[in-house]
């Protein structure tokens, strides 16, 4: 399948075929990820979820006050529902600033981002080393659909 809208999702899906891992980011609006990233990920993952399986995923959120953990959780669900290893850091993957200069002043957030990058690189190297040693990602069982109406 292909999304009928021609706004970048299909182009992203093509690039996702050869990607080793993913980092998605969003500002926090009303304690959730932006509607734009949510719509984008809904469409990309719904149509081509198999492309993402086994590839590490991480998300980064940006906010000043509450809502970071809710948005972080919302974005991580795309990874966990699609059998993707989730890359973590030393805290929620959160940083704040309205400009690049302001973000650089968020010392804790910047450290969290560096740790996230290091952890992503380590996991990608580990996956490659595993493949070279003959260890592959577990084969998925056929999905079982539960219907409580019998």
Regions picked out by a protein language model, each given a short descriptive name:
Residues 85-150:
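Glycine-rich phosphate/pyrophosphate-binding loop and the adjoining helix
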Residues 4-91:
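Helix-loop-strand module that forms the ligand-binding subsite of alpha/beta enzymes
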């Amino acid at each position: 399948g292909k999304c009928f809208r021609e706004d970048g999702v299909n182009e992203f899906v093509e690039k996702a075929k050869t990607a080793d891992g993913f980092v998605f980011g969003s500002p926090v609006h009303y304690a959730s990820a932006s509607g734009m990233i949510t719509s984008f990920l809904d469409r990309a993952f719904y149509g081509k979820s198999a492309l993402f399986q086994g590839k590490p995923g991480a998300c980064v959120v940006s906010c000043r006050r509450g809502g970071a953990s809710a948005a972080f959780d919302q974005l991580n669900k795309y990874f966990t529902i699609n059998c993707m290893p989730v890359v973590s850091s030393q805290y929620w993957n959160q940083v704040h600033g309205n400009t690049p200069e302001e973000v650089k002043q968020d010392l804790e957030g910047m450290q969290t981002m560096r740790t996230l990058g290091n952890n992503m690189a380590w996991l990608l190297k580990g996956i490659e080393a595993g493949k070279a040693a003959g260890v592959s990602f577990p084969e998925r069982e056929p999905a079982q659909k539960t219907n409580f109406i019998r």
